[in-house]
Swiss-Prot record:
It comes from Cercopithecus mitis (Blue monkey). A lipid is attached at residue 315 (S-palmitoyl cysteine). Residues 1-37, 94-118, 184-191, 267-279 are extracellular. It comes from the Eukaryota. Keywords: Cell membrane, G-protein coupled receptor, Glycoprotein, Lipoprotein, Membrane, Palmitate, Receptor, Transducer, Transmembrane, Transmembrane helix. GO terms for cellular component: plasma membrane. This is Melanocyte-stimulating hormone receptor. Belongs to the G-protein coupled receptor 1 family. Residues 64-72, 141-163, 212-240, 301-317 are cytoplasmic. PANTHER family: G-PROTEIN COUPLED RECEPTOR (PTHR22750). GO terms for biological process: adenylate cyclase-activating G protein-coupled receptor signaling pathway. Glycans are attached at residue 29. It holds the Pfam family 7tm_1.
Length: 317
């Protein structure tokens, strides 16, 4: 994605020399100040992308294969896996092309590299936006299934889910093209940050409300069976821990990237902000880590999906 200091990585590699051995240490910024820079080895970057790619391909394959998983909930999970797959795949492709250009194994004109960079930017940006949208869609779907359980199947139908999926993908592609075309405008970057915060607030509000309802339900069952208080207190602690992990992972993996965008608007020339800008590849790696974790949280916990996955893997052998 086009952002300060990193918006033309492919073009920069045409005339660059191979980078030094990746490290974690102090680097000097433009003002001479010392700052912490975490360099991500290309091998690690590609490895993370490959793990994410394999995981999410397995999720998409399992859902496509099992007709029992052709429901609105799994439709959103499948699209989340697809968007995470594209995030990882596009970053892997960009890294691989950069390495080939730097090694002289790939010869290309600047115009060709520019077009390739634009295509990768659109794929990366649109898939990132789609991933955030589908995380929100999954939260909304689960909320409706709990608070409108009796009407769930009439509210969330497969045709409506498909229309929502189509709308998310179309909007993600259109807005990503708009963002990339006007990436140097502060308003565009702020819109992205506001969108991230809106998704974070939406997920937090919905999941906290669901946790409160689950605790009320557990307390009702405890009173019905005349259980001791520690039983439902333990449930509440477990639910709170699960919620903290879910939202914590989301914030830790996505937050630094959007902090990066915010600082581009607020302090593009400040020495401290310049130090943070140097860690852009680390922020991308965290997003890929989120793409690795998403299947573990949303997909692999399903017994039906795990069973289908075993069948797929056994058949492949």
């Amino acid at each position: 994605m086009p952002v300060q200091g990193s918006q033309r990585r492919l073009l920069g590699s045409l005339n660059s020399t191979p980078t030094a051995t990746p490290h974690l240490g102090l680097a000097a910024n433009q003002t001479g100040a010392r700052c912490l820079e975490v360099s991500i080895p290309d091998g690690l970057f590609l490895s993370l992308g490959l793990v994410s790619l394999v995981e999410n391909v397995l999720v998409v394959t399992a859902i496509a294969k099992n007709r029992n998983l052709h429901s609105p909930m799994y439709c959103f999970i499948c699209c989340l896996a697809l968007s995470d797959l594209l995030v990882s795949g596009s970053n892997m492709l960009e890294t691989a092309v950069i390495l080939l250009l730097e090694a002289g194994a790939l010869a290309a004109r600047a115009a060709v590299v520019q077009q390739l960079d634009n295509v990768i930017d659109v794929i990366t940006c649109s898939s990132m936006l789609a991933s955030l949208c589908f995380l929100g869609a999954i939260a909304v779907d689960r909320y409706i299934s709990i608070f409108y359980a009796l009407r769930y199947h009439s509210i969330v139908t497969l045709p409506r889910a498909r229309r929502a999926v189509a709308a998310i993908w179309v909007a993600s592609v259109l807005f990503s093209m708009l963002f990339i075309a006007y990436y140097d405008h502060a308003a565009v970057l702020l819109c992205l940050v506001v969108f991230f915060l809106a998704m974070l607030v939406l997920m937090a509000v919905l999941y906290i409300h669901m946790l409160a309802r689950a605790r009320q339900h557990a307390q009702g069952i405890a009173r019905l069976h005349k259980r001791q208080c520690p039983a439902h207190q333990g449930f509440g602690l477990k639910g709170a821990a699960t919620l903290t992990i879910l939202l914590g992972i989301f914030f830790l993996c996505w937050g630094p990237f959007f902090l990066h965008l915010t600082l581009i608007v607020l302090c593009p020339q400040h020495p401290t902000c310049s130090c943070i800008f140097k860690n852009f590849n680390l922020f991308l790696a965290l997003i890929i880590c989120n793409a690795i974790i998403d299947p573990l949280i949303y997909a692999f916990r399903s017994q039906e999906l795990r069973r289908t996955l075993k069948e797929v893997l056994l058949c492949s052998w």
